[in-house]
Amino acid sequence: GRRPCCNECGICDRSLDPMCICEDLVPQCHEGCQACEEVDTGTPMYQCRSFEYYHCGTPCL
């Protein structure tokens, strides 16, 4: 499948094809996110807290 973009990747593992935690707050978690947490910012936003494959640094539209 296509990898979700991520503006700001946080912790990544050290493999050649790293899995990362994305720090972005999004209206809904991407399909395949294993640990989606709601973040209260006044409007319901979500953050994927599991290690996933992303296109890091790709501007998200």
UniProtKB/Swiss-Prot annotation:
<feature type="disulfide bond">
    <location>
        <begin position="29"/>
        <end position="36"/>
    </location>
</feature>
<dbReference type="InterPro" id="IPR035995">
    <property type="entry name" value="Bowman-Birk_prot_inh"/>
</dbReference>
<keyword id="KW-0722">Serine protease inhibitor</keyword>
<keyword id="KW-1015">Disulfide bond</keyword>
<dbReference type="Pfam" id="PF00228">
    <property type="entry name" value="Bowman-Birk_leg"/>
</dbReference>
<dbReference type="GO" id="GO:0010951">
    <property type="term" value="P:negative regulation of endopeptidase activity"/>
</dbReference>
<protein>
    <recommendedName>
        <fullName>Bowman-Birk type proteinase inhibitor B5</fullName>
    </recommendedName>
</protein>
<comment type="function">
    <text>Serine protease inhibitor. Inhibits trypsin (Ki = 41 nM) and weakly inhibits chymotrypsin (Ki = 410 nM). Does not inhibit bacterial subtilisin.</text>
</comment>
<feature type="disulfide bond">
    <location>
        <begin position="33"/>
        <end position="48"/>
    </location>
</feature>
<feature type="site" description="Reactive bond for trypsin">
    <location>
        <begin position="14"/>
        <end position="15"/>
    </location>
</feature>
<dbReference type="GO" id="GO:0004867">
    <property type="term" value="F:serine-type endopeptidase inhibitor activity"/>
</dbReference>
<dbReference type="GO" id="GO:0005576">
    <property type="term" value="C:extracellular region"/>
</dbReference>
<feature type="disulfide bond">
    <location>
        <begin position="5"/>
        <end position="60"/>
    </location>
</feature>
<feature type="disulfide bond">
    <location>
        <begin position="6"/>
        <end position="22"/>
    </location>
</feature>
<keyword id="KW-0646">Protease inhibitor</keyword>
<dbReference type="InterPro" id="IPR000877">
    <property type="entry name" value="Prot_inh_BBI"/>
</dbReference>
<comment type="similarity">
    <text>Belongs to the Bowman-Birk serine protease inhibitor family.</text>
</comment>
<feature type="disulfide bond">
    <location>
        <begin position="12"/>
        <end position="20"/>
    </location>
</feature>
<feature type="disulfide bond">
    <location>
        <begin position="9"/>
        <end position="56"/>
    </location>
</feature>
